[in-house]
């Protein structure tokens, strides 16, 4: 990278500053003709490539991007009037470049608005005054004590009444539970009695069935004997008839 060349006129800014003594630095006016001629010489001698080189070295935009030095600025036209003199402070403020963070807008005045309501008193009023205003007819201490005793008595009566009602309801619930348990026990005993009766009836039927089986077997044996006897008698009769026929 080639080294950037800076004009000596840029480095030497003494031509832009007014030459005045120490006691006249704050109040003495400057010759407007000499200041205007020095600014014209600076604008004619300085070229744009040198400002571009300075901008590349500094890495930030310079005044070369915003000001055209080839034409005379109309904002400085009042400097051509020889009757107008400016102090050094006014000239410094005139030619100073505002920084990036500086605000270009005028700071608003902080005068109080005429429509703003006056500030209210933030001190809280006295507690006694509030109580007296809230209760204009305050009751004595004895009446409040009696009233609280009445409230306690009514509350006690209310609780006793509902305690009694809850006690009666609990007694009824327990009695109902006892009655239900007794009913279930009675039904259980009835079912047990019926079960035992059915078991006895079943055993009796089983016994009668066994007796009927035995009686049936006895009748079968008798019937077989009678059949055999009748068959033997019939055979005997047939034998006698055969003997008679052979004679």
Curated annotation (Swiss-Prot):
Ranges in a coiled coil: none
Keywords: DNA-binding, Nucleus, Transcription, Transcription regulation
Chain positions covered by the region annotation Disordered: 1-48, 100-143
Biotechnological utility: Stilbenes such as resveratrol, piceatannol and pterostilbene affect the expression of the OTA cluster to reduce ochratoxin A and B production and thus could be used as naturally safe and efficient compounds in food active packaging or preservatives against ochratoxin A in food. Pterostilbene with methoxy groups demonstrated greater inhibitory and antitoxic activity than resveratrol and piceatannol.
Regulation: induction: Stilbenes such as resveratrol, piceatannol and pterostilbene downregulate the expression of the ochratoxin cluster.
Basic motif: annotated segments: 156-196
Compositional bias ranges of the Low complexity kind: 23-47
GO biological process: ochratoxin A biosynthetic process
Gene3D superfamilies in the cross-refs: 1.20.5.170
Biased composition (Polar residues): 134-143
Domain bZIP: 156-219
One MF term in the entry's GO annotations: DNA-binding transcription factor activity, RNA polymerase II-specific
Annotated Gene Ontology cellular component terms: nucleus
Disruption phenotype: Results in the loss of production of ochratoxin A and the intermediates ochratoxin B and ochratoxin beta. Leads to down-regulation of expression of the cluster genes otaA, otaB, otaC and otaD.
Annotated InterPro entries: AP-1 (IPR000837), bZIP (IPR004827), bZIP_sf (IPR046347)
Compartment(s) of residence: Nucleus
Ranges where the record places region Leucine-zipper: 198-212
Function: Transcription factor; part of the gene cluster that mediates the biosynthesis of ochratoxin A (OTA), a mycotoxin demonstrated to have nephrotoxic, immunotoxic, genotoxic, neurotoxic, and teratogenic properties. Positively regulates the expression of the cluster genes otaA, otaB, otaC and otaD, and the subsequent production of OTA.
PANTHER family associated with the record: ACTIVATING TRANSCRIPTION FACTOR 3-RELATED (PTHR23351:SF24), FOS TRANSCRIPTION FACTOR-RELATED (PTHR23351)
Protein name in UniProt: Transcription factor otaR1
Gene from which the chain derives: otaR1
């Amino acid at each position: 990278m080639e080294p950037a060349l800076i004009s000596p006129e840029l480095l030497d800014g003494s031509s832009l500053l007014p030459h005045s003594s120490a006691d006249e630095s704050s109040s003495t006016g400057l010759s407007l003709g000499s200041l205007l001629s020095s600014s014209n010489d600076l604008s004619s001698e300085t070229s744009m490539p040198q400002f571009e080189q300075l901008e590349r070295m500094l890495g930030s935009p310079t005044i070369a991007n915003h000001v055209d030095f080839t034409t005379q600025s109309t904002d400085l036209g009042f400097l051509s009037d020889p009757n107008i003199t400016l102090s050094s402070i006014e000239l410094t403020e005139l030619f100073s470049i505002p920084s990036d963070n500086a605000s270009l807008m005028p700071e608003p005045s902080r005068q109080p608005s005429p429509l703003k309501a006056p500030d209210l008193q933030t001190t809280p009023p006295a507690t006694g005054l509030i109580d007296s205003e809230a209760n204009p007819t305050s009751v004595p201490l004895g009446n409040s004590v009696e009233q609280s005793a009445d409230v306690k008595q009514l509350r006690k009566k209310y609780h006793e009444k509902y305690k009694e009602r809850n006690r009666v309801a609990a007694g009824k619930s327990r009695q109902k539970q006892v009655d239900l348990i007794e009913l279930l026990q009675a039904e259980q005993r009835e079912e047990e009695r019926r079960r035992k009766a059915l078991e006895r009836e079943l055993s009796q039927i089983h016994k009668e069935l066994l007796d009927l089986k035995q009686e049936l077997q006895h009748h079968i044996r008798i019937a077989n004997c009678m059949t055999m006897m009748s068959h033997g008698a019939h055979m005997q009769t047939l034998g006698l008839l055969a003997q008679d026929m052979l004679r």
